[in-house]
Swiss-Prot record:
Subcellular location: Membrane
Alphabetical UniProt keywords: Glycoprotein, Isomerase, Membrane, Transmembrane, Transmembrane helix
Taxon lineage: Eukaryota, Fungi, Dikarya, Ascomycota, Pezizomycotina
Transmembrane residue ranges: 10-30, 81-101, 118-138, 192-212, 233-253, 334-354
Glycan-modified residues: N106, N140
Domain of life according to the entry: Eukaryota
Topology term for the membrane: Multi-pass membrane protein
Protein family: Belongs to the membrane-bound ascI terpene cyclase family.
Listed name of the protein: Terpene cyclase ptmA
GO cellular component: membrane
Record carries keyword Plastid: no
Taxonomic source organism: Penicillium ochrochloron
Pathway participation: Secondary metabolite biosynthesis
EC top class, as a word: isomerase
Amino acid sequence: MSRVIRSILIILGSVALYTKYYLSFQNGFIDLLSTMGSQGSLAGLQSGLRSHYTGLDPLDRFLKACNVFFWPIFHGTSPALSLYAIAFAGSMIPMWLILLMHTCVNSSIVEIVMINALAGLLVQGIGPGVIMCVLLAMRNTSMKEFAVTGIPAVSILGPNDLPLSLVVCYILPLALSSLPAPASISVPSKQLFIAIWQGWPLYIALAVGIAHSLRNHYRRNRPQQLFRHAYAFALACSIISHVGLLSISFLSVSPQSPFLSLHSADLHPRSLLIPRLPWQEVKITSLESGVLRFLHWDYSISSTGTLLWCYDVYWKDRMRGRGWIAFFSLSSRLATMSLAFGPCSVALALYWAALSNNLMKSENARKR
């Protein structure tokens, strides 16, 4: 099944390029972003776009474009967009953790830091819809290597190091970027926080490397213990954000909904949860609608690709040799769980089931 999954991932990456970038040129979204950038304006503000961040002109231009794109998400001009972005942000944690855990096979701590920093920056800069599918298509879905190595490179880390690095390097910058401006912070400061948040994959990779060096003389932990805390944390973030999105969206349909007066049409499940099909494209007239459409496809494709890849990992490890009945039975259960708890939550659970099984085999083999 691996060849089929790899082909599907490549197709999904191509679809992401088409829906996110090609159609964004066709429907006027890229032109709208460029116009706002050249005019120095932000969604909901006529001016105030910050131009200087680092002193490096290419990097400053990139961060300026990031602020134009992300401003309506963090500024809250569209409740539906901000709500969907929260669910997307929650799903990024299990996606990143899956990449990190799989990179740990036969890798030194330097390789782990460099690979995840580079991969994470590509995911943040281009989008997980394209990069996650490409990265996963390049990775082997076999767990045999885990049963041999037992992930020695990162076993020196403490069990709370990974969750703490996620909180400090990813969630904290997100929270600071979400502070209301100008009520709590100034508009330039909010833009600076948004710019700082763009580097979260690099910060996490560096935090892992620093934690490893500080614990160089510590007793090694069991790999299951190390990743169990990170797994539980990532799963909780993903489930809470997804269930929150579903709850508010479906509550908006009720006549007694507290969200009825708050853009209830935008919060309707049909508008908020289902991306507009490519042949239903319309001209983008507002930045908020363009960003939401962009995130729709980015989230849908990246989460689908991650789920399919983890499904293949789990099937190879736990279900090899089963027939079509087992395949369709498992697929139907996973589809239901994905709708209820989020596809990235289910993907992480599948991956952890296969990983923990092989780590336990590795530990038992070393004890003999």
